[in-house]
Amino acid sequence: MLQNSELLQEYLPIAIFFGIAVLVSGLIMILPNLLSTKKYNKDKLEPYECGFEPFSDARSKFDICFYLVAILFIIFDLEIAFLVPWAISLNTIGKIGFFSMMFFLFVLIIGFIYEWKKGALDW
């Protein structure tokens, strides 16, 4: 077991790196606002479309199907994020780990079939 001083010595470089990263990120976000000149006019507030006059308002509505596909993508992308570490450690986790992941996949497959049957994937 590591003592407090040893633990501090182990994690001090990580804490310093994290602190510097937060400081640099904050500076990168704040400095342009402080140093730039702010001259707003009608042309700068318009959306830019490759040098042409805008055809319509840039704030157009999207069909709900796009949001649904995005949410389904995130859910099944997270499935892959869980599957990769499981596949790497498959030899060491034994039967309990195997059947837990099979149950997890079963629940996801049931959810996918439900979405399919409800017509969420039909356009």
Swiss-Prot record:
Signal peptide: none
Record PANTHER family: NADH-UBIQUINONE OXIDOREDUCTASE CHAIN 3 (PTHR11058:SF9)
Transmembrane segments: 11-31, 64-84, 93-113
Protein name: NADH-quinone oxidoreductase subunit A
Record's subunit section: NDH-1 is composed of 14 different subunits. Subunits NuoA, H, J, K, L, M, N constitute the membrane sector of the complex.
Family from the record: Belongs to the complex I subunit 3 family.
Topology versus the membrane: Multi-pass membrane protein
Biological role stated in the UniProt entry: NDH-1 shuttles electrons from NADH, via FMN and iron-sulfur (Fe-S) centers, to quinones in the respiratory chain. The immediate electron acceptor for the enzyme in this species is believed to be ubiquinone. Couples the redox reaction to proton translocation (for every two electrons transferred, four hydrogen ions are translocated across the cytoplasmic membrane), and thus conserves the redox energy in a proton gradient.
EC number in record: 7.1.1.-
Main enzyme class: translocase
HAMAP family: NDH1_NuoA
Chief site of localization: membrane
Key words, A-Z: Cell inner membrane, Cell membrane, Membrane, NAD, Quinone, Translocase, Transmembrane, Transmembrane helix, Transport, Ubiquinone
Pfam families: Oxidored_q4
Species of provenance: Rickettsia conorii (strain ATCC VR-613 / Malish 7)
Reactions mediated catalytically: a quinone + NADH + 5 H(+)(in) = a quinol + NAD(+) + 4 H(+)(out)
GO molecular-function terms, A-Z: NADH dehydrogenase (ubiquinone) activity; NADH:ubiquinone reductase (non-electrogenic) activity; quinone binding
Localization: Cell inner membrane
A cellular-component GO term for this protein: plasma membrane
InterPro entries per UniProt: NAD(P)H_OxRDtase_bac/plastid, NADH_UbQ/plastoQ_OxRdtase_su3, NDAH_ubi_oxred_su3_sf
